[in-house]
Regions:
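A short, surface-exposed interaction/processing loop segment used at functional sites
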Residues: 53, 57-84
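Alpha-helix initiation/capping motif
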Residues: 21, 54, 108-109
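C-terminal partner/receptor-binding element of secreted or periplasmic proteins
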Residues: 73-124
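N-terminal secretory signal peptides
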Residues: 1-46, 50
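Alpha-helical structural elements
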Residues: 4, 30, 58, 67, ...
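Generic detector of leucine side chains in alpha-helical contexts
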Residues: 5-8, 25, 37, 62, ...
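Generic structural hydrophobic/aromatic packing signal, biased to beta-strands
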Residues: 8, 20, 35-37, 60-63, ...
């Protein structure tokens, strides 16, 4: 539901709007933070993906892509990829550094991540 979408500020130059589905957020026993990412383009198109970020190795993984608003299709490229700080995939770097795995700090719990996303502010 739209009420569960938490806005994610990516950059002042981003042309799309980014959201994390708060109900999808989880931290697994393997330490991977899993979440549903919703990207809305300026023209109204929406992309939905189920992803994970592994703090220990600074990597991300795309598990599945949403299709037709009701089904998931498994990603064809489900290999772990190093998180790069570039304009194309900046949302992953923001989630990694500012919300899920802040450098030099204790890893936040799920409640803290959700609170920070709700506030629209990083945890520092």
């Amino acid at each position: 539901a739209s009420a569960d979408l938490l806005p994610l500020y990516v950059s002042s130059t981003a042309t799309a709007s980014f959201f994390i589905d708060g109900k999808s957020l989880s931290i697994a026993d393997d330490g991977v933070v899993r979440y549903t990412l919703v990207i809305r383009g300026s023209g109204g198109a929406e992309n939905v993906s189920y992803e994970g970020i592994r703090c220990e190795t600074a990597e991300r993984k795309l598990y599945a892509i949403g299709r037709n608003g009701s089904e998931w299709v498994r990603s064809r490229n489900d290999a772990w990829q190093v998180i790069a700080e570039n304009a194309l995939n900046r949302q992953h770097a923001v989630l990694f550094k500012e919300y899920f795995c802040p450098p030099g700090e204790v890893r936040p719990g799920l409640d803290q991540i959700v609170r920070s996303l709700r506030r629209g502010a990083v945890m520092r």
